[in-house]
Amino acid sequence: MRGSTTIRARIMPATSRFPTAPFAFACLLGLLALFGLWYGIGQPVTLADAATPTHKLQCASYTPFDKDQSPFDQPMQLRPERMEADLALLAERFECLRTYSVTDLEELPNMARKHGLKLIVGAWVSRNPADTAVEIAGLVKIANAHPDVVQAVIVGNEALLRKEVTPQQLVVLIEQVKAQIKQPVTYADVWEFWLKHPEVAPAVDFITIHLLPYWEDNPAGIENALHEVAEVRQTFGNAYAPKDILIGETGWPSEGRQRETAVPSLVNQAKFIRGFVAMAEQNGWRYNLIEAFDQPWKRVSEGAVGGYWGLYDADRQDKSILAGPVSNLPHWPTWLMISLALAAAALLWAGRPHSPRAALLLPLLAAVGAACIGLFAELTLVTSRYVGEWLWAGALIVLNLVVLSHGALLLSSRNGWRARTFNWLHSRGALWLTLSGFAGAVMMLALVVDARYRSFPSAALLLPALVYLCRPVGGYRREVALLALLIGACIAPQLYQETLSNWQAIGWAMTCVLLVAALWRSLRVKAQAA
């Protein structure tokens, strides 16, 4: 079909027979597809339990922030009632907790004692000597005041990784603390930094290493993650004997972007944690799991993935990571209902299809549109952090609704208000396509230039790409050509840096290929119309 701003509809006569068979078949197919999509994502998986009412785990990282709090918001007041409730909950499954700072945590040892918990207390070491001195003094005070609760202390967390202190400065701080307390003293960092700075090891009483396969320079997928952890732990055990080794952080994220073969999900988090606990207890390793609760504030600096390492969510609800069946999307029936309602609304909006072929395509379009909007809305709830990100995501959802409305009316027997609405939408078809191309260019550039913490928004642009690839619209020739070239030029670099083992990146690249094809076809429509 040719043309850029108008389209001649093939109107089915009012007396013609409704194409019931193809329409019903397509509706059934769309229904099954939506059910299969959401059930496939959310189906429960049964794994061997890591924790039981009679078997507690060793230790978990604990930061006492509520879901609306962040250490970046100063001054900040910690909530004693929150800490009290947290410790009561964690005492059901853990023997000890690890903390990272002593600021405003003077009462934490008393609360821990009340609930039968031990503590590994950390002092936050930073590039500011005055702040570090306050932390060290507080650490010594807490350790000496509560020797029955504080079983070890950690002087600094990944300070060498952040390059905030030198190894020599760190050793001085460690020796300073060792001279004033009786508990064992250690320093905690990613395992590579112990190898890069061997001069720190003689100063500590035991070695504390962080093993996070997801964050490795060469990320390990869930299938190989435990093997990698075991190899590093064995290497350190042999290299530093007779000093003990504490795995100070290990875990897996439940949400966020894929890194090579490492895929964040609730099921993968449960697989890793349960498998690791079994392996650690079989080998007699000391360990601390990261972390007790999801920390939304970490998304500011680490993207969506940073906020979802908890064994419980930010509302202190069990994520089923330690025991019981686990689902990647526990509320999948809700998303299924939303998608079905959206698909039904699209069918009602379109009304009577204009031909038997349209009767087959219309329900499928409605299902694809409902799936894309639902998937992107679910992603938005996970990734959006600021007002600007919420507005951007909201604009993309509105754009998808407009494109779905346009596409549905393309297949409709239009009369009355449907004809008027279609004419308004179709006369602006070039605008909807250009806006889709602009969004694609912005997100593609971000994923090429600053990809580390960004998720792949494939669902946001798949519907516009498909609709305008199948039914091209002309207009804005110069802008469309520029957007097509820009997106197309970024596809190969984006895939190269993500590697072909990243199926999320491949999905985004394929979406962009479809979008570029739609943009390119619109240029041909313009040329034909001229």
What are these regions (language model features)?
Residues 60, 97, 153, 207, ...:
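Conserved, mostly hydrophobic/aromatic
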Residues 108-184:
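Substrate-binding cleft of extracellular glycoside hydrolase catalytic domains
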Residues 115, 121, 151, 189-228, ...:
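Aromatic- and acid-rich polysaccharide-binding/catalytic face
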Residues 123, 177-195, 242-249, 285-295:
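Aromatic-lined carbohydrate-recognition surfaces of secreted/lumenal glycan-active proteins
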Residues 211-219, 238-269, 294, 298, ...:
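Active-site clefts of carbohydrate-active enzymes
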Residues 353-530:
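Alpha-helical transmembrane segments of integral membrane proteins
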